[in-house]
Amino acid sequence: MTVELHLGDCLEYMRTMPDKSVDAVITDPPYGINADKGVGGFGASKTDKHYQAGWDVTIPDIDYFDNIERVSPKLFIFGGQFFTKQVQPNGHWLVWDKVGDIKFKNPFGDCELIWTNVKRNSVKKYTVIQQGFIAEEKDRFHPTQKPIKLIKSMLLDYTHEGDTILDPFMGSGTTGVACVQTGRNFIGIEIDPTYFAVAERRIQEAQLQPTLPLEVNA
């Protein structure tokens, strides 16, 4: 199993990658939402630790989407509804249900859409509950950080052990941690040095953990 981490612009790096050189892209691109206004009316400020790195300033242009489609046969894009003009119209949707049967209101949204180009009969709904405003991880490093359990479920459902996964907007490295824990190779790219350092540390810590038997999703 290999891990490659690159600090820099993801588009510049992807332009050097051969066609279909990875097995899947799982990524959460910036949506271009104004952080001063918060998410879903919650009113978070850029003085919050999650906003200090200047995340979510611009939306990736069409070259980004052309390149992820070129380097990978399988695409999974969180917040895909923000990119309907950039992605292919024949895609499908995964649904991340953050609430399930629990009756509470999540100000960041009760569900999240993930655009994918996998076949329709493979699409699933994931119920990975984020109770309150905090993700399942003890430490939260990024404003849009996803639960490791969610990414692991997607990897087990749609990829194979030994596959290579690319995350062009690596953030705090959750996809990389999930790849280490499920025996996938990982290529992560992050332009922000602060988040890159966090991702590097988290992935290194995951590599030091003993390998546990995988729970294969049905």
Language model: regions and residue ranges:
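Extreme N-terminal starter segment of soluble prokaryotic enzymes
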Residues: 1-5
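A conditional alpha-helix N-cap/helix-loop micro-motif detector
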Residues: 6-7, 57-61, 144
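Conserved SAM/SAH-binding loop
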Residues: 8-12
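Class I S-adenosyl-L-methionine
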Residues: 17-27, 31, 35-49, 69-218
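A short acidic, glycine-rich active-site loop
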Residues: 48-62
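A short glycine-rich, Lys/Arg-flanked "PGG" loop and its adjoining helix->strand segment in the class I
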Residues: 58-74
